From Swiss-Prot:
Name of the coding gene: tsdA
EC number: 4.1.1.103
Protein name: Gamma-resorcylate decarboxylase
Originating organism: Rhodococcus jostii (strain RHA1)
Keywords recorded for this protein, A-Z: Decarboxylase, Lyase, Metal-binding, Zinc
EC category name: lyase
Length: 329
């Protein structure tokens, strides 16, 4: 197989580096910092060792989304995108970029996405969950992207014809009481998936994809649990005497199988992959590692040996991403 394409692969700039400190033991923090700040050295060597031809890079989480001050959020997003563009320009055959976006201000986010796609050559955006804005309850209310204020932004995403990767972040403290006393459930063990799955379901139910059917949303971690629940979600909404009303015109499974793509980032289990293929089809699944929070060798060695057909391995490992992100043009 030609080299794999991996697309949930993170980096940091000094201003956002400490956002990742809480997700690893203190003894590992020095190594994680080095991994996040490195692009051209260890990362590239590991890519070569494990037949990863291209990485699409994105800013660590929550970064821009957790900056309530509008001007600072815009500044950090632009700074991170400029740094990433410089790094990608050194090895355009190996690295591509996802835009970081200041969605505290939908118009500013649309403008920055436009700049990143048309001037910097980025292939889409990766946004770390909901945003916080000082103008909305001082930043204490999460802003989810099904809200009406984001419709013009989504129209621009569709017009630019680039995918949007919805990446996790933890819920705000006031929304995380169920985790009190159980910090092991926060972050990638559970809270990330729950938070992101609900956000994605809100997008589906809002009617967004009826208005903008060309949108393509990417979810990591084998779909954040949604594929296993699609039948039940639609079944219960249809079965009850008075179905819960939502604006969307179709079933959740219709939007998920037509407007969503899923990656294997940070979830290296063959049984889960096979279930995902049965629910979504091999044309909408893509390989990823979640470096540097997961190890490249773990992801690549698992995927290269997974019990799937070679045709599916090629699609998942390379051609789906190459097509979606127009990398072979």
């Amino acid at each position: 197989m030609q080299g794999k394409i991996a697309l949930e692969e993170h980096f940091a700039i000094p201003e956002t580096l400490n956002d990742s400190a809480g997700f690893v033991p203190g003894t590992y923090w020095d190594e994680l910092q080095a991994r996040l700040l490195d692009i051209q050295d260890v990362r590239l060597k590991l890519m070569d060792e494990h037949n990863i031809e291209t990485m699409i890079l994105s800013l660590n989480a929550p970064a821009v989304q957790a900056i309530p001050e509008r001007e600072r959020a815009i500044d950090i997003a632009r700074r991170a995108n400029d740094v990433l563009a410089e790094e990608c320009a050194k090895r355009p055959d190996r690295f591509r970029g996802f835009a970081a976006l200041p969605l505290q201000d939908p118009d500013a986010a649309a403008e920055e996405l436009r700049r990143c796609v048309t001037e910097l050559g980025f292939v889409g955006a990766l946004v770390n969950g909901f945003s916080q804005s000082a103008t909305v309850d001082g930043g204490s209310t999460p802003l989810y992207y099904d809200l009406p204020r984001y419709r013009p932004f989504w129209a621009e995403v569709e017009r630019l014809d680039v995918p949007f990767y919805l990446h996790p972040r933890n819920p705000l403290n006031q929304d995380a009481r169920i985790y009190e006393g159980h910090p092991w459930l926060l972050g990638p063990t559970w809270a990330f998936a729950q938070e992101t799955a609900v956000h994605a379901l809100r997008l589906m139910a809002s009617g967004l994809f009826d208005e903008h059917p060309g949108l393509r949303i990417v979810l990591g971690h084998m779909g954040e649990g949604i594929p296993a629940m699609l039948w039940r979600i639609d079944h219960r909404n249809a079965w009850v005497d008075v179905p819960p009303a939502y604006p969307a015109k179709r079933r959740m499974v219709d939007y998920f199988t037509e407007n969503f793509f899923v990656t294997t980032s940070g979830n290296f289990r063959t049984q889960t992959l096979i279930d995902l293929l049965l629910e979504l089809g091999s044309e909408r699944v893509m390989f990823s590692t979640d470096w540097p929070f997961e190890n490249i060798n773990h992801a690549a060695e698992w995927f290269d040996a997974a019990s799937i057909s070679e045709a599916d391995r090629l699609k998942i490992g390379r051609t789906n991403a190459a097509t979606l992100f127009k990398l072979d043009r």
